[in-house]
């Protein structure tokens, strides 16, 4: 009887121990799945419209006006009339409806001797009203290489222009001798939009 009692007690203790043990299951961590974007013809861009908007294009051109004499005078008209830069006038501008020149650097490169005298005056005409220089305040010395930068606001570059119309003009006039003085090197940045 005693032996049987011990067995009953042992079984009861084992049963209680089994009931007290927590059940632990090892599970793999669940990672949230990212939805892959499907690229297809029927997908719309974020703008909400059914087509992709084309942003404006930026172009840079460098051209020169050579064989300037000390007494040369003339003008450079920026736009479709810019014959000094065929890639712009006969190229890019014919491929778009609108353009905007945003930056201009006019550099004078001297070729004159150190004993030469005189200067070349220049003037910005943002409204294309003048054909000859009106003011000679701003000038380059014939014997010194210099450059001048014009801001976007100064060159009428805050609005878009039709590619059939010019934007602005730079006039110049020298007061030196009729000898080769140097050349102009012009760098411009042009925005275009609305391709033809």
Swiss-Prot record:
Its main location: virion. It holds the Pfam family Luteo_coat. Keywords: Capsid protein, T=3 icosahedral capsid protein, Virion. Residues 32-44 have a biased composition (Basic residues). Residues 27-55 are annotated as: Disordered. It comes from the Viruses. It is found in: Virion. One of its GO terms (molecular function) is structural molecule activity. GO terms for cellular component: T=3 icosahedral viral capsid. Major capsid protein. Belongs to the luteoviruses capsid protein family. The N-terminal region like those of many plant virus capsid proteins is highly basic. It has been suggested that these regions may be involved in protein-RNA interaction. This is Major capsid protein. It comes from Bean leafroll virus (BLRV).
């Amino acid at each position: 009887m005693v032996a049987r009692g011990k067995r009953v007690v042992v079984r009861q203790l084992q049963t209680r121990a089994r009931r007290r043990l927590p059940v632990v299951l090892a599970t793999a961590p669940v990672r949230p799945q990212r939805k892959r974007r499907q690229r297809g013809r029927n997908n719309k861009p974020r703008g909400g419209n059914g087509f992709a908007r084309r942003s404006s294009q930026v172009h840079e051109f460098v051209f020169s006006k050579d064989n300037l004499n000390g007494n040369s005078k003339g003008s450079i008209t920026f736009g479709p009339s810019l014959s000094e830069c065929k890639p712009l006038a006969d190229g890019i501008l014919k491929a778009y409806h609108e353009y905007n020149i945003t930056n201009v650097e006019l550099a004078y490169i001297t070729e004159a001797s150190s004993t030469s005298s005189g200067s070349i005056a220049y003037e910005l005409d943002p409204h294309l009203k003048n054909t000859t220089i009106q003011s000679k305040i701003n000038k380059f010395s014939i014997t010194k290489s210099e450059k001048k930068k014009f801001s976007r606001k100064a060159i009428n570059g805050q609005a878009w222009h039709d590619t059939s119309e010019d934007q602005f003009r730079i006039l110049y006039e020298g007061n030196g001798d009729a000898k080769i003085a140097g050349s102009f090197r012009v760098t411009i940045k042009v925005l275009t939009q609305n391709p033809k």
